[in-house]
Amino acid sequence: MMHICHIEIDTQGLPAPTPEIEQERKVAIFDLLEENTFTLPHEDAPSGPYRLSLAIREKRLVFDIDTEDGAEAAEFHLSLAPFRQTVKDYWQICEAYFDAVKKLPPSQIEAIDMARRGIHNEGARLLQERLEGKAEIDTDTARRLFTLICVLHFGA
């Protein structure tokens, strides 16, 4: 089956996350491992499941992919530049959401959450575009990976 069976986030050199960011990371990893679709499209690529390591190195997002038994499957680097504005917008709306949960009525929280989901969907769409030809992922997998990119980008 073509999916991610293990994920590691390389936070070496990044500041410690806030409790909210750590919670976002934990939820995204849990949800991702519960259900995801991840395929390496080139015909000579080993089949999954895959172990994925995400890192930021030299201002680039690094996907390091191994097979379940540890054999190298692929590695590719994506520029962070196309993600910067969407990540920034996502964290701004997340801050508003975290504040709203503490003091606003449910109707206002729902409005902020809808905006947050919209930005999240945009980030997922952008990630799917950037991965074209490198990896094929479904929308839910893209959303969860985008969350992890945001977590990494926050500290970078």
UniProtKB/Swiss-Prot annotation:
Instruction: Give the signal peptide as a residue range, or say none if absent.
Output: none
Which ranges of the sequence are coiled-coil? none
The record's Pfam families line, in alphabetical order, gives: UPF0262 (PF06793)
Family, per entry? Belongs to the UPF0262 family.
- List the NCBIfam families hit by this protein, alphabetically: PRK02853.1
The protein's name: UPF0262 protein Jann_2882
Which species does the entry assign this protein to?
Jannaschia sp. (strain CCS1)
Lineage of origin: Bacteria, Pseudomonadati, Pseudomonadota, Alphaproteobacteria, Rhodobacterales
